[in-house]
Amino acid sequence: MLNSQSGNRLRIDFSNVPQQIDIPNLLQLQKKSFDYFLNIDAKNSESGIEKVFKSIFPIHDPQNRLSLEYVSSEVGKPKYTIRECMERGLTYSVNLKMKIRLTLHEKDEKTGEKIGIKDIKEQEIYIREIPLMTDRISFIINGVERVVVNQLHRSPGVIFKEEESSTVANKLVYTAQIIPDRGSWLYFEYDAKDVLYVRINKRRKVPITILFRALGYKKQDIIKLFYPIQTIHVKKDKFLTEFNPNDFLDRVEYDLKDEKGNIIHQAGKRMTKKKAEQLVKDGIKWVEYPVEILTNRYLANPIINKETGEVLFDSLTLLDESKLAKIKEQKTFDIANDLANGVDAAIINSFIQDNETLKLLKQTENIDDENDLAAIRIYKVMRPGEPVVKDAAKAFVNDLFFNPERYDLTKVGRMKMNHKLGLDTPEYVTVLTNEDIVKTAKYLIKVKNGRGHIDDRDHLGNRRIRSIGELLANELHVGLAKMQKAIRDKFTALNTDIDKVMPYDLINPKTITVTIMEFFTGGQLSQFMDQTNPLSEVTHKRRLSALGEGGLVKERAGFEVRDVHATHYGRICPVETPEGQNIGLINTLSTYAKVNDLGFVEAPYKKVENGKVSNEIVYLTATQEEGLVIAAASTKIDEKGSIVEEFVEARQDGETILARREEVHLIDLCSGMIVGVAASLIPFLEHDDANRALMGSNMQRQAVPLLTAQAPIVGTGMEKIIARDAWEAIKAKRAGIVEKVDNKNIFILGEDENGPFIDHYKMEKNLRTNQNTTFTQHPIVKKGEFVQVGQIIADGPSMDQGELAIGKNALIAFMPWHGYNYEDAIVISEKILREDTFTSVHIYEKEVEARELKDGVEEITKDIPNVKEDDLAHLDESGIAKIGTHIKPGMILVGKVSPKGEVKPTPEERLLRAIFGEKAGHVVNKSLYATASMEGVVVDVKIFTKKGYEKDARAIKAYDEEKLNLEKEHHDRLLMMDREETLRVCSLLSKSALNSDEEINGQKYKKGAKVDIKELEKINRFALNSLVKAYSKDVQKEYEDLKNHFQNEKKKLKSEHDEKLEILEKDDILPSGVVKLVKVYIATKRKLKVGDKMAGRHGNKGIVSNIVPEVDMPYLPDGRPIDIALNPLGVPSRMNIGQILESHLGIVGMRLGDQIQEIFDKKQKDFIKQLRTKILEICSVSRLTLEKKFVESLNDEQLISYARDWARGVKFATPVFEGVTVEEFSKLFEMAKIAMDGKSELYDGRTGEKMAERVHVGCMYMLKLHHLVDEKVHARSTGPYSLVTQQPVGGKALFGGQRFGEMEVWALEAYGAAHTLREMLTIKSDDVEGRFSAYKALTKGENVPATGIPETFFVLTNELKSLALDVEIFDKDENNE
């Protein structure tokens, strides 16, 4: 369907359901997050940056003399544009102005308390260089474009787990963790003996009761918190307890006897609710508590002799018969009922454990209070070996979990805690409370006894996304915390002159800048942006990484973390993830997924009520959809929106179930919501194996932009969405008519409530991207065309008419071709080369610096010693290659000489210098040469000169050119502004009536008449000026206002222009020691070559093995030769059948395109009618009749423009999981006059004979990937050697050799090639003397002498010597043996 945003192209869409909501902006997550951090849009709410400042400030002096407070902050404007930052190697950033208040307090000398305020000083402090996000959602750091990837990390909160015990076989260990966003982690765990322990930050574990005591709980309080208290009454030597039916539900462990000793219920039998109620009715109030069970219970409260007040037994005393005999005198006593349902003896066991610890501590510390001792114990575990005071220990425990400066659960953590433990603590309490810790322990005991719910840490309710704003806020917090420490140190150092101190003396903003820049330059999540094509860029910004600070370590990440989880459905793409060690740790957001304010990923669903699908769309997180029954998007629905079948397949909590239609709560928004952006570009994805789909989506990101882009015949409808959200394409901000368009500018004239306006859009040309591909924008609108808001008016690289186009449609055949396509190799026709189908342009940047050295300054010059004049012919007078020069390997790009240390010259040298000029003697050639693989044309040169150094002729020329361009651009914009002003004035006058009779353009107008706008537009500006006087005062005033408005606009434009000129004239900022920097840009055309890697969209990749003359390629009966021959064996085992279906639909598109072209060629009278009929016939295939309606609404001119596009191939959109069916294929085949099996007869191009079998010929979208053979081919003659081993270095970058490894040695051994092997292991490797003498012998034409001892042997002997082993090498002859 032609969406208003889809450029000028019609596609036949096979969607089952019309799209109900637009796909959310693909980059909104990052933009929203950064805007919140810097508070760019919202002016009222608190920004991320302010929150961080408020969490650190105020900072108080320990002696109560001073305090520093944060007042406000203000974000500045960037100094340079994005382009200038990239050229000059600067950071695109803003300055942050922070207002700080320093308060001096009056102090009471005796008490040290504050009495009042002595003085208040306010100062603004600048924090330099806070990187600013560009409008393309990236950052420019030191001239390089980078992206900050979103992090997927464990959400703060509480989590309960069960794991297999590492010590005891077949035993499960239960643990709980309270995870904060910042602060100490708290672990609760059972050991093998069922004691409940707690550990802080993975330190030594302590019994949990020690933690409770350190928090101030008494022994009895703890028992009451965890155990039901059972009161035992002593009557006539019997122990009785009240009969509470709830205590005895389920199985009863002992015979229940009443007061008289009659058995009312036998042991081991289940007591039903009914039976229990019957017993209550029968008047059973007391039951006997058997002595044998009582003897192993513990007292809940101490037993005190009422007469003497002496404590007979403390609480938690284990009862035995002798103790019971003593207790009998008491009428009642309490025991802790650890046999009740849902509790166990863990806490009692912990008490027994901690008793011994505290006994020891009592003796060493001389403190009786057990709560103080517990705090000391925790302090000793956390800080072993440090002396401790009880107050310090208490403060330490308090700081661990209850101090907002040290501990932060965040709003998310608090929400998760409340949800899991059933608390209602307010969400602004982001530290722990005692209740949190107690409830966690209680829940863990419940989990252990099978009554709680174990969490799944890979569930998306327990993982959240930290985007750029939050990551930056965390970094800023780290920087401020460092600064806070430094300020406190300065406070203590202040003794005298406190009155003179200013905020600036205390605050060093550099700490903040350094921390933030460290994050951008060295952080794991800040990455060099993948800019190969628009798709790579969009997916890079949508990436979710589980690595990074506070995340996982890839070496330790297990299988579960990497696996696809049921909650990923509609939130995280199950397909797109890298192959290799990062598999599953780096993911991508699904197409429709959104991230809410708390950082949880949400998926969209439609609500279903009583089996009827409503149009209400809800976004739910993984936690919110727990327990709901969700039907798939493919569920059959009738016209009224009711579900057709009574039972439907649905999902509930990750399980697939069969549910009645009335039970269904939600239905998926659409089938394609499961996968991410890259995977949803693969047509017929549902027919591909997941492994291949993964390769397909990863390889699309590596497709290089080609010379001309061509949209796929078989698309999925996602192509336009990526173009819509990628910054590469230019979109119209306001609707209007194209006024002027050229190669670099588009002007659009429109009208809004203020009258006419003209918008200006500038296009970039031939820029180098991060991956050295070319970035060029070109207009796709014509003068006079109407443009809507958001419509794409200029294509970027890899775009065609506002759609992503990363490859080319090629005619392919699945057939072997003389063995050349063995093992996935690809045979291509020479026609592809001739037509530059797969030719791409790459731009390389080479730079050279002239530095200040101790012997003088390096110089960029043409005057280079010992270089032939011919080799310098292509350099200009400044020594830099001219633009347009063809560069070949070994040519000089920039001439540079470096001063040599002055040695006293000999008389001969002095004479030569006197004759031939001063230069040659004391400089060395340090020029920049083109590398071995570099071939191309110099397209641009940039020269930067340091302040105080003279600019050379080339730099002055470049400056003049740049200035001229700026002047021209300024002039164009002024002209357009004048035009806009005239239009506004004409519009104003045409709406108003004349106040007097006037003659305009020879035509007379009476008073009160209105002049037509077209007539007014013919008058020049100055005549208009006088004409205004013929209108009313109000009109004249409006005219004056308009004039003033445009004068101000022109002033603004002028000041902008002056600012640009000023920046141009400014001295360049260069690193210290660098005097001049020259950057040379070389463009290379890379044609398709043998060895280049190509791929389809289904993970079908291969290397070009042969380029065959067009005449030798197999051809179709109509004489058309195929472009590419692929190996049919690559399909069945890989199970990516999508490519077969794609090529079927592709050939249909081609054939139907030929039929439309035929109508054009014949050009009969009623050809427009024929075109319309044909196009409508083709459109009838679509499932929704939207295209039909659209075509019917077109006028003839529009119809022809769409038909011209279709003549090159009818375009289809087959969305993922809604692909073309068999029935539709047969209909299409019939229409395109293709055999029903999709195969064609083929003829051998070499012999002209018909092939024995019919062959599958189709049209497939092929990509050329950026693994180009030109950049990989490498050979070494002689080159650098490694210092220690004296073996040649490795790698292309170092001009290294190919490693002849262990297995290669085996191969030569197997052949018995002894001499070759000896040569490989000695003179070609690390026999230093041997290679020197071999070179000598070769130059003299003698035989190569015998080899010496390899350096490796000396390395080995020296290593042995370092172990104090004396190793000597004896020669045979020496000892006359």
Swiss-Prot record:
This is DNA-directed RNA polymerase subunit beta. The gene is rpoB. Belongs to the RNA polymerase beta chain family. SUPFAM superfamilies: beta and beta-prime subunits of DNA dependent RNA-polymerase. The keyword Membrane does not apply. Keywords: DNA-directed RNA polymerase, Nucleotidyltransferase, Transcription, Transferase. It catalyses: RNA(n) + a ribonucleoside 5'-triphosphate = RNA(n+1) + diphosphate. GO terms for cellular component: DNA-directed RNA polymerase complex. Its EC number is 2.7.7.6.
